[in-house]
């Protein structure tokens, strides 16, 4: 599972005790939270001994009485003892994200900032091709090693 940061929220599915849930990936949450209206009525829960901070005013906060088996978005085995409260959507916190091996990466730019500034001053628009109609190649040409040492610059 991968998600690029955009106007859409990073949402993924997980299977807890055989039941599928969809939730928001929330690296700022210490624990995972299941929406009270999605918590199965026959699954045991208890009043939480600690409150939840950062999600507004939650009047009723529960926690699963059991540690539950969970499969992540790519079938990663994990366990969770989620909190349960009245929120609009489920939150996958770091308790699950760590077990799933979640990473946040920022790609290294293909070109240096200096070369990007030069290209921009010359009229280059990122994502567009080079040329009068901006229809040229959009990705760099890869250099290929000539193992046979034939062609331009090599004797025949």
Swiss-Prot record:
GO terms for molecular function: aspartic-type endopeptidase activity; nucleic acid binding. One of its GO terms (biological process) is viral translational frameshifting. It comes from the Eukaryota. Residues 111-156 form the G-patch domain. Active as a homodimer. Belongs to the peptidase A2 family. HERV class-II K(HML-2) subfamily. This is Endogenous retrovirus group K member 21 Pro protein. The gene is ERVK-21.
